[in-house]
Each structure stands twice: as structure tokens, then as C-alpha cells.
């Protein structure tokens, strides 16, 4: 079984990584498993990290973030080392003003509860990728939500096709090519669970909507989602019908 959370010693670079907009223009149908280059949806080098475990010699004050099609990377700028988190390991991700909250599967590297915050004083990462994509924390959160959704749908399609035909599916359902046809920053991600009302929770910029519940996590209120499929996903005017999996939630 592949390790879902692991230490890495090389960060994404311009040689092995392309922006999602460039990928959309050349290859509108996303195959998460068989691309020879990483696809980057959001990144930035002005962040800090806190976690519920001892990070040993790692300095969490200055980190860079990379949201790729394959995984989410936290890069420790002062240590020149990173932690790669596979999307199936992310149980919950939430946004609270200037913080991203992650609950990930049990591991021996970075702990299970992670908070990422903006840090304008973070040490500069000289990676040229940041000249192409330098994202705000809200964009990072939206990118994690979007790619997590792709992986959830891909996993379910693999299961469904294997159950019917006896062979694994290689690609995401074709409906997701419509999702890939627009720029991520225009994401309008809305949904409604069975036990929720019609109230929509808006991001600070008033653009993005999320349906969910409030849950007290002991130190703050966070709007977020669990890994799931929604019945409909509206992505910049393109509507794609997706199969239903886990419900979307908002922490109280």
C-alpha cells in the first residue's frame, strides 16, 4: 500500500510541473494517474504551520504550499525538505478567515491536526513556480477542495466500473472535463446535504458558497468540507453531474 503521508526532498519545479490553466488549454480531459508532469492548482511561500505533534528539527514558521493534481505538499523553507500528503489522507479541510485547518489520517510525520496561516514574514522561496502561481490562502483552500473532489470521484468511478466489468477504470468520468474547462479562481462550489437547510455560507469575498453544519472544534469555528462527491458541482458556468458520496459539512 502506498504511504499517504511521507517526507520528500525535492519540491515541484518548472521542469516537472505545469499550471492548471496551461494544462486545460492543451489537455482538457484530466487523467490523474498517468500524466508525466504535475499539474499545479495553487501555491505560495508566505505561510506558517502548527500541528498537534512535535515536528522535531523542522521549522514550521516558514512554509510553502503546493496544491498538485497528485498530492498536497507542505515545504519547509528553512529546512529544504517537504511533507507530501495524498488527498485520500485528508479527512477534513476547513477555512477560517486567514487559516486552513486540516484533519489527516494518523501518521508518524506531521500529526493529525494541522493549521496553516498566512505569514508575510516567511522566508522567501526562490522557486520560479511562484512567479507563475502565487496564491492567497483562500485560493489554496479552494484548490484543495477541488482536487480532493476529483480524487473522490475518480476513486468511486474506479470502484463502479470494476464492479461491473471486472477491470479497473483508468480515468475520471468524462463529466469532469467540463469542470477542468475554467480557471480555478472562479470556482463557485455549492451544495446541500440531506439534513441541511438552504442557507449558503459565503466566503469573505462573497463569491464562493458552501453548505454545511457548525461544529465546535474547541478553539475556533471553521467552514469546511469532508472528502465527498456532491450531486452537482457548478464550476464557472459549467454544470457537471457527479455521483453522490460523502456529505459536505461545515464545522460549528
Swiss-Prot record:
Major subcellular location class: cytoplasm
Domain of life the protein comes from: Eukaryota
Keyword flag Cytoplasm: yes
Keywords: Cytoplasm, Nucleus
InterPro entries: PH-like_dom_sf
Family the UniProt entry places it in: Belongs to the LOT5 family.
Name of protein: Protein LOT5
Source organism of this protein record: Candida albicans (strain SC5314 / ATCC MYA-2876) (Yeast)
Amino acid at each position: 500500500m502506498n504511504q499517504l503521508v511521507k517526507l520528500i526532498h525535492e519540491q515541484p519545479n518548472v521542469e516537472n510541473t505545469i499550471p492548471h490553466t496551461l494544462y486545460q488549454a492543451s489537455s482538457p480531459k484530466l487523467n490523474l494517474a498517468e500524466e508525466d508532469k504535475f499539474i499545479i492548482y495553487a501555491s505560495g511561500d508566505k505561510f506558517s504551520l502548527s500541528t498537534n505533534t512535535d515536528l522535531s528539527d523542522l521549522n514550521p514558521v516558514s512554509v510553502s504550499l503546493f496544491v498538485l493534481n497528485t498530492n498536497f505538499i507542505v515545504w519547509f523553507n528553512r529546512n529544504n525538505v517537504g511533507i507530501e500528503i495524498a488527498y485520500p489522507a485528508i479527512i477534513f479541510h476547513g477555512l477560517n478567515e486567514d487559516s486552513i485547518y486540516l484533519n489527516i489520517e494518523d501518521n508518524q510525520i506531521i500529526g493529525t491536526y494541522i493549521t496553516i496561516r498566512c505569514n508575510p514574514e516567511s522566508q522567501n522561496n526562490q522557486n520560479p513556480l511562484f512567479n507563475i502561481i502565487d496564491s492567497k490562502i483562500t485560493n489554496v483552500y479552494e484548490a484543495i477542495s477541488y482536487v480532493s473532489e476529483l480524487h473522490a470521484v475518480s476513486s468511486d468511478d474506479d470502484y463502479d466500473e470494476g464492479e461491473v466489468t471486472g477491470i479497473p477504470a483508468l480515468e475520471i468520468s468524462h463529466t469532469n472535463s467540463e469542470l477542468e474547462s475554467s480557471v480555478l479562481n472562479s470556482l463557485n462550489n455549492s451544495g446541500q446535504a440531506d439534513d441541511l437547510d438552504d442557507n449558503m455560507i459565503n466566503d469573505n469575498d462573497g463569491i464562493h458558497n458552501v453548505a454545511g453544519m457548525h461544529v465546535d472544534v474547541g478553539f475556533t469555528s471553521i467552514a469546511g468540507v469532508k472528502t465527498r462527491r456532491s450531486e452537482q458541482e457548478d464550476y464557472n458556468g459549467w454544470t457537471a453531474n457527479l455521483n453522490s458520496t460523502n456529505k459536505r459539512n461545515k464545522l460549528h
